[in-house]
């Protein structure tokens, strides 16, 4: 079976191993730093304090993989072309001081539930990558004033592959996995709030991966399955509005689906794709702009 016909987390094994090894070293350093007493000022993104502490939670997207200048995990990477790196530069416009912590780990998934699911169907996620709840949330700085979350890409591939592998009622299986994922996402947000209670949290929902180039050659039945997963996960992100989280609507943005905005693997964004991510995220992250995500756009139902 060709690679495009499989539902996998799309980071190559060699790339994931190398980058997650670097991430593990970084986590050890972060753990040592977090062991020290922190005495930050209270985060107040809506106040007059011009200082910003921007934390990013994500997977390979957070290091700009697929772009022309990807970063090593936890590196400063001031010239990176990913959305996290560009957002940092945009936040600094006007002379504001911006501290930054990028916790993104390539190959990572949201929670242990997805991590265990991948192992159960013979597609284990690298143990160094782990999951956001265990490997990223504990290291959110208490000084954080602004934070982004982008979760679901690797998770969607894992859930869709597991559904196809297990057979039976695939829709019921997917819906159960999506419900658990939503519970775990709320847990992630709660853990972040414990670490940084006043931080402005912005979550990017998931595009309809069924319409992405990496699945272009797959049968319609598999695309429909992925659509069910991606729309379901995206809706769980959208539900975070009830928890005072601002949502960026990638699902319903037509430019997200332009071939030029994908890297050569058809899964990760290109520089152009990351530029769209940045454009859509900046108003919410910098200004607190709240735009209600659509529940009826055409991109939610590309396939039957």
Residue ranges and their predicted role:
Residues 2-4, 8-32:
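Sec-dependent bacterial lipoprotein signal peptides
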Residues 206-304:
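Catalytic His-Asp segment of secreted/periplasmic serine-dependent ester chemistry enzymes
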